[in-house]
């Protein structure tokens, strides 16, 4: 440790053997703060103690994110539901869109935990699920809206629900698959990085986009739209008139 010339300050350096963003490094910040607080109380010090450095900064950021991100998730999903309700004129289709995208996110989180935590013995960096949620919600919604609006166009042209689904898949399914392969493959190139965090981000985003574009959008979404039938397009009357005038 270092002592200031006036004897009022002491600086101690603690070196951990893990990456700054790892959970173990940030856990060491909490342990150090608790130990200093207990020692100060026992010794009766009238002094302040601070734990600083990259892990401490990241720990504080992680703490704020953990406490607020759940509300952000809810707010974003409510906003997206409202926008999709206005765009599609349907009560249930926006719910189906959000559910299928979250399905891809949940599958990816499970695979990420399996591969990195259980197989490779690494920790899943706390920021990876946040990045995954934000980017998948944007990219996955693009693919979903592209297919759903094509189905909607078929309904407006007078197709039955199943014929509209088949027509939409024939017109847009290949485009969605190609875009997913390009985007997913691009993210997967991060696996060659030497950084565990970049590897996890690349794997998570690449896997999620491939699952969404190769499985969820071409198969799960049409299957659910088939099961929902005409309920897919039930919505406010004024929006139904705007989007094609389907009857109840």
Language-model features: locations:
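Membrane-water interface of transmembrane alpha-helices in multipass transporters/channels
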Residues: 90-99, 117-133, 192-207, 214, ...
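Membrane-proximal cytoplasmic C-terminal regulatory module of class A 7TM GPCRs
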Residues: 226-248
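Internal alpha-helical transmembrane segments of multi-pass membrane proteins, especially GPCRs
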Residues: 66, 70, 74, 99-100, ...
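Structured non-transmembrane domains adjacent to transmembrane bundles in polytopic membrane proteins
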Residues: 1-92, 101-114, 118
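Re-entrant/interfacial helical elements at transmembrane boundaries that shape
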Residues: 11, 98, 132, 145-152, ...
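Helix-loop junctions and hydrophobic alpha-helical segments within the transmembrane domains
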Residues: 154-177
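Hydrophobic transmembrane alpha-helices and their membrane-interface caps
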Residues: 93-148, 225
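Hydrophobic, glycine/alanine-rich multi-pass transmembrane helices and their short helix-loop junctions
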Residues: 81-85, 137, 170-234
């Amino acid at each position: 440790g270092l002592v200031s010339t006036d004897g009022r300050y002491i600086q101690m350096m603690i070196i951990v053997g893990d990456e700054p963003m790892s959970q173990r490094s940030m856990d060491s910040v909490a342990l150090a703060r608790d130990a200093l607080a207990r020692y100060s109380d026992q010794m009766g010090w009238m002094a302040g103690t601070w734990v600083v450095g990259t892990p401490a900064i990241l720990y504080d950021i992680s703490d704020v994110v953990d406490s607020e991100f759940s509300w952000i998730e809810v707010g974003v999903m409510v906003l997206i539901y409202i926008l999709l309700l206005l765009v599609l004129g349907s009560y249930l289709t926006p719910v189906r869109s959000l559910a299928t995208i979250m399905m891809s996110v949940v599958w990816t989180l499970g695979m990420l935990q399996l591969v990195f935590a259980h197989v490779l013995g690494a920790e899943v960096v706390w920021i990876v699920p946040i990045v995954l949620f934000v980017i998948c919600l944007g990219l996955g919604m693009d693919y979903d809206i592209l297919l759903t609006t094509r189905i909607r166009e078929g309904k407006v042209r007078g197709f039955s629900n199943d014929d509209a689904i088949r027509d939409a898949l024939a017109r847009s399914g290949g485009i969605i698959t190609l875009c997913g392969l390009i985007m997913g493959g691009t993210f997967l190139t991060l696996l060659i990085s030497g950084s565990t965090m970049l590897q996890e981000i690349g794997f998570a985003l690449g896997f999620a986009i491939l699952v969404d574009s190769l499985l969820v959008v071409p198969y799960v979404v049409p299957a659910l739209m088939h099961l929902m039938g005409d309920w897919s397009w039930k919505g406010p009357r004024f929006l139904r008139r705007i989007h094609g005038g389907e009857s109840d």
